Amino acid sequence: MSTNFEKHFEENVDDCNLEQLRDILVNKEGKSALANRFRALFNLKTAASEFEANPSDAEKAVQYMGETFGDNSELLKHEVAYVLGQTKNLKAAPLLRKTMLDLAQQPMVRHEAAEALGALGDKDSLEDLEKCLKNDPHVAVRETCELAIARINWQHSDAPTKESLQQSLYSSIDPAPPLALEKEYDLEELKKLLNDQEKPLFLRYRAMFRLRDIGTDEAVLALASGFNDPSALFKHEIAYVFGQMGSTAAVPSLTEVLGRKEEAPMVRHEAAEALGAIASEDALPILKQYLNDEVDVVRESAIVALDMWEYENSNELEYAPA
């Protein structure tokens, strides 16, 4: 989910204490709309991230978010895993390891738990990540473990201090850093590296995030070429990146991917959310087409994306100069 989504949801919750936020998140009364559950989640994330200033509340927030892993919503659980990884709070690592290893959870949730462990840079999770890399029955989980292991090893090497990295416009902790600035690449070179299936996935992701940070329409088109890749994980990350970039140049390719009935749900759901984040006029009727999609995670993503679309466009009207 894009940082625009997060900003929206953080701004739209009335003042609640942690227990009230938990009750909304887990839908204790059975009446909480999905969008409000996301709002509660991102407010709990804020508390969990403040583990140095308020460790007690941070630990509670992690625990309360973890209660959601018993929910039926694949979309919500996957978002909880993502959020836990973004908190930088290592107290979340045991919960994420348990979720990653739980074969009763949906693969999309387990993949997100593995990615979150990479985002945390948790060395204590390397053993379990290696185990999943070798033995997990789902390709997307194995590929995510490969990335998470590479990211943790990169983070704990001297590379972060030696490499010159572009200051990111985005607040997210990504599955891989962008390619270092020491070497100059033109767009064609980055596109070629992005699509080279012989190269390590971590390196291809680094090319992806370098293209994201370039941010031009030409970079969008180069990224869109990755939608032809066989890896659902890879394609879902491109859709996520498009949601961050907010470029209308991505709308045609996202629309095409969302419409692929044979495509993996994790890819289609991310395409829907990206269209909501971009919030262009032509995205609205597209998203409405999927409000009754037969795939739960796609249908729920369309609901959340429309909530975001309406927010972005109402703000645009409200703040438009006279």
From Swiss-Prot:
Localization (cell): Cytoplasm; Nucleus
The protein's enzyme class: oxidoreductase
EC number: 1.14.99.29
Keywords: Cytoplasm, Hypusine biosynthesis, Iron, Metal-binding, Monooxygenase, Nucleus, Oxidoreductase, Repeat
Catalytic activity: [eIF5A protein]-deoxyhypusine + AH2 + O2 = [eIF5A protein]-hypusine + A + H2O
Cofactor note: Binds 2 Fe(2+) ions per subunit.
Gene Ontology, cellular component aspect: cytoplasm; nucleus
Swiss-Prot/TrEMBL GO biological process terms: microtubule cytoskeleton organization
GO molecular function terms noted in the UniProt entry: deoxyhypusine monooxygenase activity; metal ion binding
Binding sites annotated in the UniProt record for Fe cation 1: 78-79, 111-112
Family matches, as Pfam families: HEAT_2
Cofactor: Fe(2+)
Main localization (coarse): cytoplasm
Domain of life where this protein originates: Eukaryota
Repeat positions for HEAT-like PBS-type: 109-135, 203-229, 234-260, 267-293
Amino acids binding Fe cation 2: 236-237, 269-270
Pathway participation: Protein modification; eIF5A hypusination
Function as written in the Swiss-Prot or TrEMBL entry: Catalyzes the hydroxylation of the N(6)-(4-aminobutyl)-L-lysine intermediate to form hypusine, an essential post-translational modification only found in mature eIF-5A factor.
Family: Belongs to the deoxyhypusine hydroxylase family.
Name of the protein in its database record: Deoxyhypusine hydroxylase
Gene that encodes it: LIA1
